[in-house]
Amino acid sequence: MQYKGMQMSCEQVVLSDQDRLARANGTVRLRRADGLRINADRLNWQTSGNDAYFEGEVQVKKGNMSLETPSLRFMGQQNQALYQKGGTLRQGSVRIVSDQGTGYLDDEVYSFEGRVTVAHPELDLKTHRCVYHARQDSLALQAPSRLVSLRGTFQGQAGHYLLKRKELFLHSRTEAAWAVMDSRYFVLADTLQVDQQQRSAKARGQALWTDSVRKISLHARSLQFDSAFRLGLTPMFPQNPLVRQGLHATGRVWLQDHSVQPPMDWMTESMQAWFPSSKDSLVVWTRDSSVCKVQEWLMRSNTLLADQARGFLQAEGRWMAWQGLSQMEASGLHWSDWRDTLSMLDFQGPTGISEMADSIPLPVYHQASGQKAKAELRNRTLYRMELQGNTVTLTWNRGSDSLWAALNRTEAARAVFDFENQTLARARYYGGPRGTYQPYGKVKDPQSLLEGVRPQPDLKRALEQSLLDRKGSYPDRGLVQLLQGLPAWDF
């Protein structure tokens, strides 16, 4: 039987001219000149609208597309197929199983709803609604979706996946999109873009990256993960940059590095990093003003480079640090072997140190400055500090009435200070030391004495509060649950 370019064969057919309806049974085959083939057990064909209803082991084939379903409605004028009782579509290496589906055969676009499962040699996908564009070989995800590939597990509330290019884009509406890669890296963000072929990713909007093995967490508004070479990391290129994983974070960056002891908290506006190896900690640096907290140390600087694996830290641009009651300032700093019990601080440029006090007339006990300095630490606590070149020291002495009574001023070529329990214990002066003594009442303007190295407790408190505020601005978005195990998929 032929009608409007359609050819049908079957074992039995009933024609109704009044209803313009053809009912066919028994191995029904429908053929069209463009290559469309539909096989079924039964067919109701409304010839006026060229609509056909197939039932019983329906099989549709056109080119490399095939569909199997218990029942199918085919609308010939729109060249559209629809099923609502479950079906399986195959297109090349893609296999899609769903509760309902619609195929737009002219455009080779297929829409699926209900419980949708996509199988591919390189991925498995579960969702509640998606659209497959066969010509572009891409999936548009229109509902919460979970994708499992060789690289990891990914979930978002919407997005798309380019199968040939192996690129995934996920975004969130109410819950964060997330990824678990290589069973150790956890990424959460408002939007997540992953290139599995290049092994790179971008996360934007309340972004979080966590290495559960190294125990490192990085928060930012935007995160990018790629090889150190493609990121163009500066100021240093790692050896074999193509195979070294790199990170680039921008916007309200907060880093927690617990990979080695002591742990480090770091706050800045942009940061770059790379991994020397899969076992080593990050090498991180920034050219933005930053605040860093390591054990009892609180530091700020304009630039900062830290290598946790080697225990090395370098800071430049008005470096300031606090430990206990002591405050230090310099143009820059090299801190070597900070992970060891014994370590050294090498200060760059004019250096000052001051020590807070808890009484009047001034909230300062000791101030000193020199042209350069170095310090020795034991258990990461200030043990000895040496100032060199035009050293000036101011020391307030306590009187018998428990008030500050006098000011000692000492000038020398070199001064060495010994500390105990994070407070000054002894001072030694070399190179023609000269000293003066003034009662407090004769000091004209004590507030201006060594202004550049006066303690700034308000700044310290403000920096500590900014660290707390930065931490509070990044609430948990599901990381705790992911670390305990992937949540069950709700179908």
What are these regions (language model features)?
Residues 1-491:
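Mature-chain termini and adjacent capping regions
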